[in-house]
């Protein structure tokens, strides 16, 4: 399940690029119910790093926790447990959100004309270019028309790929 490239991509997105998140999941799967302190000790990372990753997993509903009060210290402690049975739902939801975002970008690209500055490598909509008199506000160079047909093609391919993954990926069935 965690070896599926689509699942890995969604988890990577949930962890906001922090690959330690995969190690946290591995420890949770190995130990089942465990404390954040035990995870931090096993991975050799700071407790706040583990907590941040656990909170991200919790926000995605991929872990749950139990809270209890230590009678000696009066501090609350947490034990965490994986709830990865929800992973297919989470992956579908994230992929559908991504498809919607890509479709919005595609619509924007199709419905606008663009110009760019070859010096500064900055792109402008037609309206922005017109406001600047078709000269770059950064360097003063004349703006050139930007052909976004390749970008449109790439967006269409990404959308098609993700829709096919949703339909055909055995993990998401």
Swiss-Prot record:
Pfam families, alphabetized: TFIIE_alpha, Zn_Ribbon_TF
One GO molecular-function entry: DNA binding
The keyword Thylakoid is annotated on this UniProt entry: no
PANTHER family assigned: GENERAL TRANSCRIPTION FACTOR IIE SUBUNIT 1 (PTHR13097:SF7), TRANSCRIPTION INITIATION FACTOR IIE, ALPHA SUBUNIT (PTHR13097)
Family: Belongs to the TFE family.
Domain HTH TFE/IIEalpha-type: 3-88
Domain notes: The winged helix domain is involved in binding to DNA in the preinitiation complex.
InterPro entries linked to this entry: TF_E_archaea, TFE, TFIIE/TFIIEa_HTH, TFIIE_asu, TFIIEa/SarR/Rpc3_HTH_dom, WH-like_DNA-bd_sf, WH_DNA-bd_sf, Znf_TFIIB
UniProt key word Transcription regulation: yes
Protein name, entry field: Transcription factor E
Gene, per the UniProt record: tfe
Keywords associated with the record: DNA-binding, Transcription, Transcription regulation
GO BP terms, alphabetized: regulation of DNA-templated transcription; transcription initiation at RNA polymerase II promoter
Gene3D superfamilies: Winged helix-like DNA-binding domain superfamily/Winged helix DNA-binding domain
Described function: Transcription factor that plays a role in the activation of archaeal genes transcribed by RNA polymerase. Facilitates transcription initiation by enhancing TATA-box recognition by TATA-box-binding protein (Tbp), and transcription factor B (Tfb) and RNA polymerase recruitment. Not absolutely required for transcription in vitro, but particularly important in cases where Tbp or Tfb function is not optimal. It dynamically alters the nucleic acid-binding properties of RNA polymerases by stabilizing the initiation complex and destabilizing elongation complexes.
Quaternary context: Monomer. Interaction with RNA polymerase subunits RpoF and RpoE is necessary for Tfe stimulatory transcription activity. Able to interact with RNA polymerase in the absence of Tbp or DNA promoter. Interacts both with the preinitiation and elongation complexes.
């Amino acid at each position: 399940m965690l070896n599926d490239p689509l699942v890995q991509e969604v988890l990577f997105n949930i962890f906001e690029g922090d690959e330690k998140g995969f190690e946290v999941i591995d420890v949770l799967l190995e130990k089942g119910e465990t404390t954040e302190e035990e995870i931090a000790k096993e991975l050799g990372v700071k407790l706040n790093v583990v907590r941040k990753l656990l909170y991200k997993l919790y926000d995605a509903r991929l872990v749950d926790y139990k809270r209890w009060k230590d009678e000696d210290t009066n501090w609350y402690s947490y034990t965490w447990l994986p709830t990865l049975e929800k992973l297919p739902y989470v992956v579908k939801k994230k992929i559908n959100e991504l498809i919607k975002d890509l479709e919005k970008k595609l619509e924007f690209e199709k419905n606008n004309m663009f110009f760019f500055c070859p010096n500064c490598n900055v792109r402008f909509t037609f309206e922005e270019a017109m406001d600047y008199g078709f000269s770059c506000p950064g360097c003063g160079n004349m703006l050139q028309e930007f052909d976004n047909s390749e970008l449109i093609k790439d967006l269409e391919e990404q959308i098609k790929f993700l829709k096919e993954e949703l339909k055909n990926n055995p993990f998401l069935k």
